[in-house]
Amino acid sequence: MRCADDAPSSDRGPGGGRYGARGARILGTGSFLPGLPVTNDEVIAAMGGDRTTSEWIEAHTGIRSRHWAPSGMATSDLAAEAALRALEAAGVCASDLGHILLCSTTADWTSPAAANRVQELIGASCPAEDKQVACASWLFGLDHAARLCATGTDPVLVLGADIKSRFVALDDHRLRPVFADGAGAVVLGKGADDDQGLLTVRLVSDGSRAMNLYTPAGGSQLPASERTVADGLHFVHMAVSGREIKQHAIEIMAGSIRWVLDEVGWGIEEVDHFVAHQANLAILKGLTEELGVGVERWPITIDHTGNTVAATLPCTLDEVMRDGRVGPGDRIIMTTAGAGYSGGAAAYVVPS
């Protein structure tokens, strides 16, 4: 079969049409970080060695502390806490929700969907489902939710939640200090097409690099066994250098941001806030340099949250909306990149 365009999605230019789910509104946000902050010194002590220092971790990742979920707490527990806070902020009852999307790489089980447990915990009765696109999960979920709203299913609860600390080897000095736990939530509702709310979303997937950063075991390709556990194959593995992952992440986010700006007709200087996934501070700084945008327009949360994977974007949104840094009329670009490779960007105007 001959196809009109065999180029990967990351190489395709703007579609030239209006975003089909344009105008969806964020009605409320919420977030939850479990337990007490875990300092760099505590991470080093947990690793049981002297392969790194607190100063090295902060200098290379930007992280001073992060949160790790206590034993007995599952991803759905974190998600439910964030959900209740977002529902309260939105003034929406759980019983009025039209759909729940739980975006996560660390669902409670392989089956059923952990979103079903969230539904039960918050007292909802609507359809609920999981979405897994690594660190880009929540942005993919936001696009899905906006399309649900556009077709009459609203409001939609979009959750990003992960307990990634349990999927990193204890002695992995590169990743153990970085990955953390948390949950963020947004209640999304339908809005008018009046140049406010969600204006467009760009999503990118590049399966040719799927094995660069992945968890080898636990799925259908390599089911759990005594050997996979003994070999540590249920932990995150980096098959390429951190430098290469950084370069690819910057390429995905910068390209997606430029596409979105072109689609909505904004100059980069017209954006008030860039809310980005924060895998580490070096990637974020590299992105600001690539785009020529001062770091003051990029809210930084990784210093006290670590990399919360799918929770990063909604947690950062919740923080800046609650502390007053974001106000009516502000133009926001959201962007992310993660394993898969997957990523993208979105343009949002805070409704007046």
PLM segments and residue spans:
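Condensing-enzyme catalytic core mediating Claisen C-C bond formation in acyl metabolism
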Residues: 2-71, 172-247, 251, 255, ...
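Short beta-strand segments
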Residues: 27-30, 103, 132, 156-162, ...
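Short acidic, glycine/serine/threonine-rich loops at helix termini
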Residues: 37-38, 111-113, 168-172, 343-347
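Claisen-condensing/thiolase-fold acyl-transfer catalytic domains that form or cleave C-C bonds
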Residues: 76, 80-83, 87, 106-107, ...
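Flexible, glycine-rich active-site loops centered on histidine and acidic residues
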Residues: 146, 152-183
